[in-house]
């Protein structure tokens, strides 16, 4: 059988009142990206040719936060129920394609579960995703006859036998475009809320003698939504534990999975060790035998083999060569590139600079817009003065240079190979090869000096 084309509808128009936030509900993040972005990504992985994103509250924020997403923006000006939301996108449906309905506040739905749902969809019928709950209170119960779904009964309308049913509706469903358009046009709003409900499609399909089947999600968390921050935090912890478990099984030593956050993607080598309270953001690549100390934050970095990053260091948009040592309390800002066997120590900040092989910047130093050669020693308290209040300028330091403590290098300036700069020096002109430069005033000794006396 030829596989049908697929489109997705993502309902994301809700305000999220219980979030107590100016952000639309679906823009609140788990694992570093908006809930709705997780759903969009899953729809892409599923092979959806079109993704119709139904939006309403906070429309400008939605469009700005998701500006790069390949979606068809469909505005729902009034929120009149789930069927009304899907109906806004119905003009875009092709009759012979499958349509899967997803929810922007249920971010953990997986490609594998949706594939099973699509595969189970009967011709001209509906496949409904359900789940078994130990406590189904408040959810619509699934009523079956001969295995098929004949109705969804809401809690308030259920009789005693129906209240004992554990299988409930998740709202996720698949049907073809023609059937969706036909049934959506017949949905009424004759209910207490005066809204148009997607669950009414089940009865309409049965009226037309079209089969409705149910596929059960094996993991309840896949279909859990987040209506408040407590539920959002529960989804976050679940996903973080799932990600940490996967990494542990791949050989990464995460000392405490409950205190590890992955907010992006992590590519890793062998024998990687990650201590507690480490945050990984964006795209991070770790080589073999990398050790990351407690409390570090790594964002969009590439780390070579045998690197140790000591506690409480922050690295962003940087590259670190093999056998380097970073921290503790180091900061690598965007554009920092450290060669092999470099040392960057406590309270050192490096931005948009390269540091050559074997060079050391060990204490209390700022290096910005600079090039440092190999086997250099940059002493404590050194500052590259790269900004004149309007423009940035470069400092270029050659190989085998020794820069003494408390030195200021006022850019633009070049220091040639083998130069030595004495402690406390301010460099304003280029330094030649193998030169010693020192600008300190002569030390004076004044005998019998009397300290000032406080006036009464």
UniProtKB/Swiss-Prot annotation:
* InterPro entries xrefs: Bifunctional_GlmU (IPR005882), GlmU-like (IPR050065), GlmU_C_LbH (IPR038009), Hexapep (IPR001451), Hexapep_transf_CS (IPR018357), MobA-like_NTP_Trfase (IPR025877), Nucleotide-diphossugar_trans (IPR029044), Trimer_LpxA-like_sf (IPR011004)
* Alphabetized UniProt keyword annotations: Acyltransferase, Cell shape, Cell wall biogenesis/degradation, Cytoplasm, Magnesium, Metal-binding, Multifunctional enzyme, Nucleotidyltransferase, Peptidoglycan synthesis, Repeat, Transferase
**Gene Ontology MF term list:** glucosamine-1-phosphate N-acetyltransferase activity; magnesium ion binding; UDP-N-acetylglucosamine diphosphorylase activity
Pathway field of the UniProt record reads: Nucleotide-sugar biosynthesis; UDP-N-acetyl-alpha-D-glucosamine biosynthesis; N-acetyl-alpha-D-glucosamine 1-phosphate from alpha-D-glucosamine 6-phosphate (route II): step 2/2; Nucleotide-sugar biosynthesis; UDP-N-acetyl-alpha-D-glucosamine biosynthesis; UDP-N-acetyl-alpha-D-glucosamine from N-acetyl-alpha-D-glucosamine 1-phosphate: step 1/1; Bacterial outer membrane biogenesis; LPS lipid A biosynthesis
Q: Where is this region: N-acetyltransferase?
A: 251-456
Binding-site residues for UDP-N-acetyl-alpha-D-glucosamine, renumbered to this chain: 11-14, 25, 76, 81-82, 103-105, 140, 154, 169, 227, 333, 351, 366, 377
Cofactor binding note of this UniProt entry:
Binds 1 Mg(2+) ion per subunit.
Q: Where in the cell is it found?
A: Cytoplasm
- Where do the annotations place acetyl-CoA binding? 380, 386-387, 405, 423, 440
Q: Which reaction does it catalyse?
A: alpha-D-glucosamine 1-phosphate + acetyl-CoA = N-acetyl-alpha-D-glucosamine 1-phosphate + CoA + H(+); N-acetyl-alpha-D-glucosamine 1-phosphate + UTP + H(+) = UDP-N-acetyl-alpha-D-glucosamine + diphosphate
How this chain assembles, per its entry, is: Homotrimer.
Role: Catalyzes the last two sequential reactions in the de novo biosynthetic pathway for UDP-N-acetylglucosamine (UDP-GlcNAc). The C-terminal domain catalyzes the transfer of acetyl group from acetyl coenzyme A to glucosamine-1-phosphate (GlcN-1-P) to produce N-acetylglucosamine-1-phosphate (GlcNAc-1-P), which is converted into UDP-GlcNAc by the transfer of uridine 5-monophosphate (from uridine 5-triphosphate), a reaction catalyzed by the N-terminal domain.
Q: Which family does it belong to?
A: In the N-terminal section; belongs to the N-acetylglucosamine-1-phosphate uridyltransferase family. In the C-terminal section; belongs to the transferase hexapeptide repeat family.
Protein name per UniProt: Bifunctional protein GlmU
Q: Which organism is it from?
A: Haemophilus influenzae (strain PittGG)
């Amino acid at each position: 059988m030829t596989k049908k084309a697929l489109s997705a509808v993502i309902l994301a128009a809700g305000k999220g009142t219980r979030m107590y936030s100016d952000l639309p509900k679906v823009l609140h993040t788990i694992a570093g990206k908006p809930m709705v972005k997780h759903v969009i990504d899953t729809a892409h992985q599923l092979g959806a040719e079109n993704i119709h994103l139904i939006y309403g509250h906070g429309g400008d924020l939605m469009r700005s936060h998701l500006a790069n997403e390949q979606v068809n923006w469909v505005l729902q000006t009034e929120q009149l129920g789930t069927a009304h939301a899907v109906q806004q996108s119905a003009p875009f449906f092709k009759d012979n394609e499958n349509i899967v309905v997803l929810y922007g506040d249920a971010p953990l739905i997986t490609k594998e579960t949706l594939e099973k749902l699509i595969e189970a969809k009967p011709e001209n019928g509906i496949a409904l995703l359900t789940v078994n709950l130990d406590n189904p209170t408040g959810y619509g119960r699934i009523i079956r006859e001969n295995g098929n779904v004949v109705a969804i009964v809401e809690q308030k309308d259920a009789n005693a036998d129906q209240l004992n049913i554990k299988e409930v509706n998740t709202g996720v469903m698949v049907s073809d475009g023609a059937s969706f358009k036909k049934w959506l046009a017949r949905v009424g709003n004759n209910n207490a809320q005066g809204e148009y409900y997607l669950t009414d499609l089940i009865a309409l399909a049965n009226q037309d003698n079209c089969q409705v089947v149910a596929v059960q999600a094996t993991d309840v968390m896949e279909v859990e939504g987040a209506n408040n921050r407590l539920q959002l935090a529960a989804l976050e912890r679940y996903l973080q534990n799932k990600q940490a478990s996967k990494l542990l099984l791949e050989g990464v030593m995460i000392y405490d999975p409950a205190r590890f956050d992955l907010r992006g993607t992590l590519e890793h080598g062998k024998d990687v060790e990650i201590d507690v309270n480490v945050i990984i953001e964006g795209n991070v690549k770790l080589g073999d035998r990398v050790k990351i100390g407690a409390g570090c934050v790594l964002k969009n970095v590439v780390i070579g083999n045998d690197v140790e990053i000591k506690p409480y260091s922050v690295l962003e948009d940087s590259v670190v060569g093999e056998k380097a040592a970073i921290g503790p309390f180091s900061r690598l800002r965007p554009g920092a590139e450290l060669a092999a066997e470099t040392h960057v120590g406590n309270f050192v900040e490096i931005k948009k600079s390269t540091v050559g092989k074997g060079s050391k910047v060990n204490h209390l130093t700022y290096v910005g817009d600079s090039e440092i050669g190999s086997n250099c020693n940059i002493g404590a308290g050194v500052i590259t003065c790269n900004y004149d209040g309007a423009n940035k300028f470069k400092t270029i330091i050659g190989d085998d240079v020794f820069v003494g403590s408390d030195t200021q290098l006022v850019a633009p300036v070049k220091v040639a190979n083998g130069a030595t700069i004495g402690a406390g020096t301010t460099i304003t002109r280029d330094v030649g090869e193998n030169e010693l430069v020192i600008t300190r005033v002569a030390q004076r000794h004044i005998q019998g000096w009397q300290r000032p006396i406080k006036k009464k």
